Amino acid sequence: MKAIFKREVKSYFTSMIGYVVVAAIFAFISLYYTANNLIYASPDFATSLYSTSLVMLFVLPALSMRSFADERRNKTDQLLLTSPVGIPSIVLGKYLAQIAVFGLPVVLACVMPLILSLFGSVSFVSCYAALFGYFLVGASCIAVGTWISALTENQIISYLATFGALLVCYMINSIQTLFTSGNTMAFIVFCIILAVVSVLIGLLCKNVTIGSAVFCIGAVALVLLFKLRPAWLLTAFNQALDALALFDPFIDFVGGMFTLSGVIYYLSVIALFLFLTGQALERRRWN
């Protein structure tokens, strides 16, 4: 795992990706920090940090897109999968390398509350709780991107799929209002989600028939539930949407509340998607 970690970190900084990711994240944090905290003399660093969370949707997929997709494109995944290194070590090595790159601008941002304290009173608990939450959100986004990268050999597809998944998580509260209203738009969005799931199943199974069958069965069930028991479907699905609200627990950290439930949620997301990444690699190893 150590060798893979070193190789991945080196590869990020021998190419432009590592520098671009670090520079982009730190630049946006610095921009909001300067505009909100330094110019207007506001001690609320947590809110400035929260304003930059949207940047993750664009930057972090660029970090995770090459983790496994590049290996498949260059056919070096065969060497990796047949090496004596276990699948968990491969996944963790690549994931921790991405975390190291992402963590660099976060560590640099830790100095910002100290600078603010030179000009007045600053709540360090709120500032560093927000930074910790920011790191956990980013680590979760990277885990999602790593799994998607393991499913494809095209970096562009990996980037777009990761961006789409994170965008859905970011806008999940807006999407949820469509379902609570029970209108036609809710049905359309549900069909789109079903189509995406069916495509993923078809890709994993490498069988268009299976993916099509899943979509047809799901569509029939969807129509029946909306016609006969719409309340059941909407209640169950709203609960599922709550679980997909990846950025919601971050709000508690921004408010200065170091919640154990938020930490457990993010660690669970990371563990789940790293496990799914390992399963995708295991499947390719046996195939």
Q: Model-found features: residue ranges?
A:
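Alpha-helical transmembrane segments of polytopic membrane proteins
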Residues: Y50-L54, A130-V137, N183-A195, A213, ...
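Hydrophobic alpha-helical transmembrane segments
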Residues: M1-D70, Y95, V111, C127-F132, Y159-L160, I188, L203-K206, ...
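Alpha-helix N-cap/helix-start motif at helix boundaries, enriched for small hydrophobics
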Residues: P88-L92, I148, L281
